[in-house]
Amino acid sequence: MKQSKVFIPTMRDVPSEAEAQSHRLLLKAGLIKQSTSGIYSYLPLATRVLNNITAIVRQEMERIDSVEILMPALQQAELWEESGRWGAYGPELMRLQDRHGRQFALGPTHEELVTSIVRNELKSYKQLPMTLFQIQSKFRDEKRPRFGLLRGREFIMKDAYSFHADEASLDQTYQDMYQAYSRIFERVGINARPVVADSGAIGGSHTHEFMALSAIGEDTIVYSKESDYAANIEKAEVVYEPNHKHTTVQPIEKIETPNVKTAQELADFLGRPVDEIVKTMIFKVDGEYIMVLVRGHHEINDIKLKSYFGTDNIELATQDEIVNLVGANPGSLGPVIDKEIKIYADNFVQDLNNLVVGANEDGYHLINVNVGRDFNVDEYGDFRFILEGEKLSDGSGVAHFAEGIEVGQVFKLGTKYSESMNATFLDNQGKAQPLIMGCYGIGISRTLSAIVEQNHDDNGIVWPKSVTPFDLHLISINPKKDDQRELADALYAEFNTKFDVLYDDRQERAGVKFNDADLIGLPLRIVVGKRASEGIVEVKERLTGDSEEVHIDDLMTVITNKYDNLK
C-alpha cells in the first residue's frame, strides 16, 4: 500500500496528559485519535494490528471448539435485574433509557444476555458442553479514564461463555481456555503472566488474570523466584508466624497528639517505630459497622474483607458516619470504645502489647493499651496486603513484586447466573439442574497497548512480526529522481506478491521519512537511495538497528531469510 494513500497522521508532540508510553506512541505514530476522554478512534495502522490480533484469537478459540457469535451491546435492564447486578454493579455501568422510558445498559460484559439466549435452548446434558465467544466493543463509565487504551470508556473485548453439566467439564474448558490464552499472548508478542485473582463484580469461585508486565501497570503481581507461584496482590495470602514482642504490661495512658493524623506522623511524634502503632478503621458490612485493626506499616485489603465476610456489600465508613458513631475523626479512632461494635484484627496485631491507638477523641491517643484488659478482639484474620520480602503461602520463598496490565481473565462462574436466571437442563437422570458456567475475557484494545508497552524503544514502536500492520517498509528517498522512483516502483510490485508492503512514496525530506519509519516500527525496511542506479539498496532491521547494502538480485532471498528469522 502506498503511504501517500494511507491516513497516518504522525505527530511531533503529544499531549502532556499522555502518561503511558503506549498512549504517547499510539498517538504519535498516528494509530489512534482521541474523540473525548476515554474514547478513541482506531486509524488504519491500528485497525490492521487489531485485525491481526483478532485473527490469532479466533484461531485459538476455534482450536478449542469455541464458536463465534455476536450479541448486541445494548442490553435491557430486566436481564440485569434478574441477576441482581443492575443495582450491584455501581456507577461504572453505562445506563440509558429509550423514548418510552425503558432502561438499558451498554454492556461491559454479557453474562446475563448470553444466559438468556441459551436458557431455553440448551435443554439436555447431551447438548453440553457448549462454548460461545464474541469480539465486540464494551463500555464502562470510568471515573478517571487514563493511559489511553488501557483504561478507556469504550474498549474492544473478546468474551467467551461456556455451559456445562458438571464441574469436571467446566474444569476441562477452564484449562483449555487457560492454555489458549497463554498461546495467544505468546503469539502476539506479550510477556504475560497468569496470576490468581479476585473475581470482582463478575463473581465466581475461581479465577486467573493474565498480566502483561509493565512499569505503568495498575496492578501489582506477587510472585516467587523459586516456584510458579503468582497472584494479584489483592489475593496473595499473608503467612502468620507468631513473633511476640510482648513486654511488661503498662498502665493505659491518654496523651495529647496535636495535628497528628497518620500512623507515620504518630510514630514520629512518639519516637517509636511505625510497626508498633495500631491503626483502626471502620467499615460497614451489610449495613453493620465493624472495626478493623492493623499495624501501622500494614494496609487493609478490602478484597480479603469481602472474602472473609462472604459479601460484596462492604464499604469504608464515611467521615460523617464515623463522627456520628464515635465522636471523632478517622485519624483518632481506636478500639477502646463504650459502644457495641465488633472488632476484627489482623493476625499480626497479636504480636504486640502496650498498643498505641486512637482515643476516639480528636487530638488524643492512648498508649499502653492491651487486648483483654482494655478491649476484646472478636476475631483475628488475614486482612491486609502482603509486603515484599514476606513468606509466600506455598512455602517456596519470599514475595517479589512486579507491576502488570491485566490483558485477560478466566472465571469459573458456577451457577451464579443460571440459578438467578432459571437456566436449567435435564441431567442423565431426567432431573432439572442449573447450567454450570465459565466466562473468559481478553481485552483486545488493551492487548494492542500492552504490545506497544513491551515493544518499543526511544525512537518508536517495534512491532512483533505476528501483529505488525505491514511486513516491510519500502522507502524511496527522493521519488523525483527517476532511477530511485523506478526501482522503488519495481520492488513494490515484486515484494507485494509475498509481503504486506508499506511504500513511502511521499514527497517528503529523507529525515521525515526515516523518523516516521522508526516511529511506525515495521520489522524490516528497504531504502532506495543514491545507489539505485547500481541496483544497490539498504536493508535495515527495526529491532536490532542492523543494516546492510544488498544488490537487488539478492534482495528477495535476503528479505525472506530475515523475515523468517523475525520474532
Swiss-Prot record:
Known function: Catalyzes the attachment of proline to tRNA(Pro) in a two-step reaction: proline is first activated by ATP to form Pro-AMP and then transferred to the acceptor end of tRNA(Pro). As ProRS can inadvertently accommodate and process non-cognate amino acids such as alanine and cysteine, to avoid such errors it has two additional distinct editing activities against alanine. One activity is designated as 'pretransfer' editing and involves the tRNA(Pro)-independent hydrolysis of activated Ala-AMP.
GO BP, sorted A to Z: prolyl-tRNA aminoacylation
Enzyme class: ligase
Stored InterPro entries: aa-tRNA-synt_IIb, aa-tRNA-synth_II, aa-tRNA-synth_II/BPL/LPL, Anticodon-bd, Anticodon-bd_dom_sf, Pro-tRNA-ligase_IIa, Pro-tRNA-synth_IIa_bac-type, Pro-tRNA-Synthase_IIa_type1
Reactions catalysed according to its record: tRNA(Pro) + L-proline + ATP = L-prolyl-tRNA(Pro) + AMP + diphosphate
EC number, UniProt record: 6.1.1.15
First-listed, main subcellular location of the protein, grouped into a coarse class: cytoplasm
GO cellular component, one term: cytosol
Family: Belongs to the class-II aminoacyl-tRNA synthetase family. ProS type 1 subfamily.
GO molecular function: aminoacyl-tRNA deacylase activity; ATP binding; catalytic activity, acting on a protein; proline-tRNA ligase activity; transferase activity
Subunit structure: Homodimer.
Pfam family, one: HGTP_anticodon
NCBIfam families: PRK09194.1 (NF006625), proS_fam_II (TIGR00409)
Subcellular location: Cytoplasm
Alphabetized UniProt keyword annotations: Aminoacyl-tRNA synthetase, ATP-binding, Cytoplasm, Ligase, Nucleotide-binding, Protein biosynthesis
Protein name from the UniProt record: Proline--tRNA ligase
Family annotation (HAMAP family): Pro_tRNA_synth_type1
Domain notes: Consists of three domains: the N-terminal catalytic domain, the editing domain and the C-terminal anticodon-binding domain.
